[in-house]
Structures are given as C-alpha cells and as structure tokens.
Regions:
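Conserved Rossmann-fold NAD(P)-dependent oxidoreductase catalytic core, especially the SDR/UDP-sugar
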Residues: 73-119, 145
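NAD(P)-dependent short-chain dehydrogenase/reductase
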Residues: 99-108, 131-208, 235-241
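C-terminal substrate-binding subdomain of Rossmann-fold SDR/epimerase-dehydratase oxidoreductases
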Residues: 176-291
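Active-site helix of classical SDR
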Residues: 121, 125-128
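Adenosine-cofactor binding site in Rossmann-like domains, unifying the SAM/SAH pocket
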Residues: 2, 6-32
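SDR active-site strand-loop-helix element
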Residues: 14, 44-50, 87-93, 147-149
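Conserved cofactor-binding/catalytic machinery of classical short-chain dehydrogenase/reductase
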Residues: 28, 43, 67-74, 86, ...
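NAD(P)H-binding glycine-rich loop region in Rossmannoid oxidoreductase-like domains
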Residues: 26-68, 81
Length: 291
C-alpha cells in the first residue's frame, strides 16, 4: 500500500512465478476477463510481455509476436470492459525504425518504417498495442499513457543466459567465468550504441506518470542523456567486477543487432525537469551487489 497526495493506493502484482490467486495466464482471454471483473481495479500498469534478449528474439520472433498480441489485446479488452480509464502501458525503444529518417528518434517516429529484423515479432506487437491505446483514447476518452524505456537493467532482472538482455547476460557470464577461470567472451563487435536506464528510475517515472493527472494520453520516451558503445558497457562491468578488460574476447561471428537506436528524451525532461537519474556506474554497482 502506497500513499500519494493523501490518497491510499494498494498495488496488486500479477506474477506467473508465484502460484496464488494473482497468477493469471495473460494469453488466456477468458482467464484475464474473469480476473479483472473479480478485482475491479482503478488503474493498470501493464508491464507484462514475452520478452528476452537479442538471441531469444532472433530465434523466436513468431511465438513472441503471437504471445504479445494475445497478452496486450486481452489486457486492453479487460480494461475497457471493466471501466479502467487510466493506466500505463510499456513500449520499448527497440520498436523504433531500424533505418529512421533522423537521429535521435522522437515519439512521433515509432511507426515511420520497419523495426530491425532481429526484433520484428516483439516490435510489431508493441506497435499494435501503441495503436490500440491511441484508438481507445480517441474513441472512449481513456487516458492510456505509453512509456518508452531504453535498455533497462538493475536488481531483480532476468539473469538467465538463454534469454536475458545485454547487461544481466554479460554480468552472469562474466561472474561465472571469473569463478571458473574460463575465457570471458562478449558477443559482436562492441560497436553498437545503447542508451541505458536503471530500473528503479523507470519505476519512479511510471509512478509519477500514473498519478500526475496533467499527463493525459502522451507517449513518452524515458531516458537520460547518456549513450554508450557496448564495449564501454563491458568496460564498466569489468571495473565493477574487478576483471581485467584486456582479457575480454570478442566473438565477432555473433550478431550485433541494431547498430544505433538513439532516442530523444526532450519530452521526458520537459515533463520531469527535476528528475535525477542514477549514474550508470552507480547503477551497475548496485546491480552487481544485488546479484
């Protein structure tokens, strides 16, 4: 239970790993509709997705697309049928065009052209959710706000080497390699550019966006001003983990994914001018300490 402007809010977290009354298969339409009808929520924060890192996406675009279409359609239908007028829906910077007309990309460019081929399933499902939110906002006057984070990292991440994102995948692998004395390998050339966002910072932005009623139906890119080559991210990790960076081997036979997907945070800074982002080196330190 949290308090905001003298209002008390109780948050219920749906988690498929916890077997309780709040365990719901979001791909099951009837289960989702029944659950929402039972609990009568006032707001929603829609974080759920079938999601993973580059190599999960490359190998599973079809099922990822199908699962996310079902999840998003079911959740949105349940919201509308049960009178939920306001909520936060999470997109991702990876849904932006692979070859945009300009950098940095802003919120108006999401549907400008095709996403990177490695991420088509997830990207198109999220783009469709974005369109659904916009259509509901127009026709039913809902206040469905779409937030667009860049690469997230932090405690409680998915560190499974089979389907994790960039930082948790590297951290897990380097930690194990250091313990066993095995060679440390990073995938690709290290040249792609990435913007990073500490997960706890994003959680604060979600909370503020939900309860700041001046924010109505916007799509908001969420990030700070920092951008790194992947090799620089690896260097930060090695410093944090007390590893000699010169020992890192780069497997350039592995895909780099999208080389650049820089997005514009102007609207974020306008809406949250006093927000203090966690510096990358501190976020990495906190993540490794938790791990």
């Amino acid at each position: 239970t949290y308090h905001n402007n003298n209002e008390e809010h109780t948050f219920i977290f749906l988690n498929r790993s916890l077997q309780n009354e709040h365990t719901v298969d979001l791909t099951d339409r009837e289960a989702v509709l029944s659950y929402f009808e039972k609990h009568k929520f006032d707001y929603i924060i829609h974080l759920a997705a079938d999601v993973g890192g580059l190599f999960k996406n490359l190998n599973g675009n079809t099922i990822i697309f199908s699962n996310n279409i079902k999840i998003n359609e079911n959740v949105l239908e349940a919201c509308v049928k049960n009178g939920i007028q306001r909520g936060i829906f999470i997109l991702s910077s990876c849904i932006f065009p692979a070859e945009p007309s300009k950098f940095p990309m802003n919120e108006t460019m999401i549907h400008e052209s095709a996403p990177h081929y490695s991420n088509e399933g997830y990207a198109y499902a999220k783009r469709m959710m974005h369109m659904q939110c916009q259509q509901y906002n127009k026709s039913l006057h809902t206040e469905f706000i779409c937030l667009v984070p860049v690469n997230l990292y932090g405690p409680y991440d998915n560190f499974n080497p089979e389907n994790s994102h960039l930082i948790p995948g590297l951290l897990h692998r380097f930690h194990n390699n250091k313990a066993t004395g095995e060679s440390m390998v990073a995938y690709g050339s290290g040249k792609p550019l990435r913007q990073m966002l500490y997960a706890a910072d994003f959680a604060k932005i979600i909370y503020h966006s939900l309860f700041d009623k001046s924010i109505k139906r916007q799509t908001i890119i969420c990030c700070n001003d920092e951008e790194f080559e992947i090799k620089d991210i690896v260097h930060h990790l090695t410093l944090t983990m007390d590893i000699n960076y010169d020992n890192i081997q780069w497997n350039t036979n592995m895909s780099d994914g999208c080389m650049k997907k820089t997005v514009d945070n102007s609207l974020c800074k306008e809406l949250f001018p006093d927000f203090e982002f966690t510096p990358f080196e501190i976020g990495i330190q906190k993540t490794y300490e938790w791990y």
